[in-house]
């Protein structure tokens, strides 16, 4: 039965940033829809008018788009929508909810009390047949009737959730395990309306490293934080997959097409998933190094432009080469920006302690030894430069590291950075010589 062509939905509230848990819920729904060639619906639960903001709605659109989670039905950023089951904003569906509410009242399955409408909760055992958690039995014999329409005319989550799932023909409800306790009420509402409920699949919670539930107040709980840090969407999406699901062979790096091909609900773990920032960093670093440079470059261009280091007039050929050598050493876009600074600007910042250690009189002497050999190089290719420095160190009776460390500090102002010889090649002969003479003094 769970192999029917699915219609699934992601229904966030536009009241703040997109939570990591919400992003994972969206991803799992999207993967399920794509795997079975079904429909992924975006629905906006904006019934809390006092907390809704246009900015939060924009963040939902932007973050889902950044993750590559395209929706088949739902509202669009330009104010339009696509799909035949709209409106896709709950605030625009009040007449629909009133109709269903009145239907329940007419059948005496709901009643008015103190101007609010209460649903008569059946006093019986309700079974939730969950595709992940299995059969769960809820004893509702002592369950109280609950409000479905408030005295001010606004509707409570339980009714609108059920009505929208019914009207939009949702086949599978894939959501966080924290909603499991609501499910008996939802099943009771479906039965009261004479309809079969969708299939339910409650996915495990995401926990902080300490083991507590990750809440919206926790640092690192917002998708936007990872965008701002310069995480790649491919890597972040890959990591979200691992928060409750994995490939059978337990391989941790995989592309989205492989995830689509292999994703299914029975493989989702029962135990809660702990968010591991170090593993996310590792995965992002793997993607930084392994993505085709042409695929990484637009991200790098965006990060560097946002940081004010480049503009539309920047030499793209040089920039791409520089990104190509820096990406081997960094894990995030923010790190890449920091490492690119000395490559993009001739105004270098030298730490006094570093100068004393590497650019003292002895250091300058070592640089002067290297300069004539660098001046004679015609091709200025990494392999040739490496051979020259190694031969020079043998000739002068020094360690190769004596030249490497001082060249790096003289050229970047730093003790760490991209591999030296590729960096020399990318900077180019003239820029290298100019920077070295600026350190050791003008050519005699």
Swiss-Prot record:
One of its GO terms (cellular component) is cytosol. It is found in: Cytoplasm. GO terms for biological process: glutamyl-tRNA aminoacylation. PROSITE patterns: AA_TRNA_LIGASE_I. ATP binds at residue 216. The keyword Mitochondrion does not apply. Pfam families: Anticodon_2, tRNA-synt_1c. It is an enzyme of class 6 (ligase). A motif ('HIGH' region) lies at residues 12-22. It catalyses: tRNA(Glu) + L-glutamate + ATP = L-glutamyl-tRNA(Glu) + AMP + diphosphate. Its main location: cytoplasm. It comes from the Bacteria. Keywords: Aminoacyl-tRNA synthetase, ATP-binding, Cytoplasm, Ligase, Nucleotide-binding, Protein biosynthesis. InterPro entries: aa-tRNA-synth_I_cd-bd, aa-tRNA-synth_I_codon-bd_sub2, aa-tRNA-synth_I_CS, aa_tRNA-synth_I_cd-bd_sf, Glu-tRNA-ligase_bac/mito, Glu/Gln-tRNA-synth, Glu/Gln-tRNA-synth_Ib_cat-dom, GluQ/Sye. GO terms for molecular function: ATP binding; glutamate-tRNA ligase activity; tRNA binding; zinc ion binding. A motif ('KMSKS' region) lies at residues 213-217. Its EC number is 6.1.1.17. Catalyzes the attachment of glutamate to tRNA(Glu) in a two-step reaction: glutamate is first activated by ATP to form Glu-AMP and then transferred to the acceptor end of tRNA(Glu). Belongs to the class-I aminoacyl-tRNA synthetase family. Glutamate--tRNA ligase type 1 subfamily. Monomer. This is Glutamate--tRNA ligase.
């Amino acid at each position: 039965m769970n192999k029917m062509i699915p219609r699934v939905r992601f229904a966030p509230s536009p009241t703040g940033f997109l939570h990591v848990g919400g992003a994972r819920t969206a991803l799992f729904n999207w993967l399920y829809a794509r795997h079975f060639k079904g429909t992924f619906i975006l629905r906006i639960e904006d019934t809390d008018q006092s907390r809704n903001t246009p900015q939060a709605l924009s963040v939902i659109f932007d973050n889902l788009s950044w993750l590559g989670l395209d929706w088949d039905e739902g509202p669009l950023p330009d104010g339009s929508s696509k799909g035949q089951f709209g409106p896709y904003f709950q605030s625009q569906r009040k007449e629909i909810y009133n109709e269903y509410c009145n239907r329940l009242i007419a059948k005496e399955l709901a009643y008015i009390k103190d101007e609010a409408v209460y649903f008569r909760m059946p006093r019986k055992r309700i079974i939730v047949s969950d595709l992940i958690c299995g059969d769960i039995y809820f004893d509702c014999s002592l369950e109280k009737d609950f409000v479905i329409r408030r005295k001010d005319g606004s509707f409570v989550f339980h009714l609108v959730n059920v009505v929208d799932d019914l009207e939009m023909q949702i086949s599978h409800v894939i959501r966080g395990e924290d909603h499991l306790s609501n499910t008996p009420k939802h099943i009771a509402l479906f039965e009261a309306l004479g309809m079969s409920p969708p299939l339910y699949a409650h996915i495990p919670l995401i926990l902080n490293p300490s083991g507590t539930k990750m809440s919206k107040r926790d640092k690192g709980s917002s998708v936007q934080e990872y965008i701002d840090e310069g995480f790649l969407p491919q890597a972040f999406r890959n990591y979200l997959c691992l928060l409750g699901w994995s490939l059978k062979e337990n391989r941790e790096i995989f592309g989205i097409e492989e995830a689509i091909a292999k994703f299914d609900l029975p493989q989702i773990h029962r135990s809660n998933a702990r968010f591991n920032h170090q593993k996310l960093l590792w995965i992002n670093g793997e993607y930084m190094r392994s993505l085709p440079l042409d695929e990484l470059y637009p991200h790098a261009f965006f990060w560097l432009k946002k940081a004010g280091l480049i503009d539309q007039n920047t030499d793209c050929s040089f920039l791409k080469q520089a990104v190509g050598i820096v990406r081997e050493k960094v894990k995030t876009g923010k790190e890449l920006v920091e490492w690119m600074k000395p490559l993009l600007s001739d105004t270098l910042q030298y730490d006094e302690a570093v100068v004393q250690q590497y650019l003292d009189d002895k250091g300058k002497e070592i640089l002067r030894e290297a300069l004539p050999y660098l001046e004679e190089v015609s091709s200025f290719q990494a392999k040739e430069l490496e051979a020259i420095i190694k031969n020079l160190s043998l000739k002068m009776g020094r360690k190769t590291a004596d030249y490497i460390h001082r060249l790096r500090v003289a050229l970047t102002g730093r003790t760490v950075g991209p591999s030296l010889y590729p960096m020399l090649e990318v900077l180019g002969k003239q820029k290298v010589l100019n920077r070295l003479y600026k350190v050791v003094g003008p050519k005699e």
